[in-house]
Amino acid sequence: MAAKIRQNDEVIVLTGKDKGKRGKVTQVLPNGKVIVEGVKIITKHEKPVPALGKAGGLVKKEAAIDASNIAIFNPKTNKADRVGFRFEDGKKVRFFKSNNEII
């Protein structure tokens, strides 16, 4: 089954404290969550690992956000958009539902 949201897609957050923020998808997780660059920043406490030369402390990183809370961003309309699938030249392609443009 093809995914509507893929790595390197430009997306916009629809709900939550980061509503309206845009960013690139850095990772798509198999449990229906995605990691978006610059969205849902959390602070993790990491222990030092002297054997690896890793210092401990507070580390800021992106946390996973549910895929239902984001939508793909359409640069032509400058809005969130829905994704559809169709076959062109024997290949399955994704397209924006608002203007039928191939992604």
From Swiss-Prot:
InterPro entries the record matches: KOW (IPR005824), Rib_uL2_dom2 (IPR014722), Ribosomal_uL24 (IPR003256), Ribosomal_uL24_CS (IPR005825), Ribosomal_uL24_KOW (IPR041988), Translation_prot_SH3-like_sf (IPR008991)
GO MF annotations, alphabetized: rRNA binding; structural constituent of ribosome
Matching CDD domains: KOW_RPL26
Keyword entries, A-Z: Ribonucleoprotein, Ribosomal protein, RNA-binding, rRNA-binding
Example GO biological process: translation
PROSITE patterns: RIBOSOMAL_L24 (PS01108)
Subunit structure: Part of the 50S ribosomal subunit.
PANTHER family: MITOCHONDRIAL RIBOSOMAL PROTEIN L24
Task performed by this protein: One of two assembly initiator proteins, it binds directly to the 5'-end of the 23S rRNA, where it nucleates assembly of the 50S subunit. One of the proteins that surrounds the polypeptide exit tunnel on the outside of the subunit.
Protein name per its UniProtKB record: Large ribosomal subunit protein uL24
Classification of source organism: Bacteria, Pseudomonadati, Pseudomonadota, Gammaproteobacteria, Pasteurellales
Protein's gene: rplX
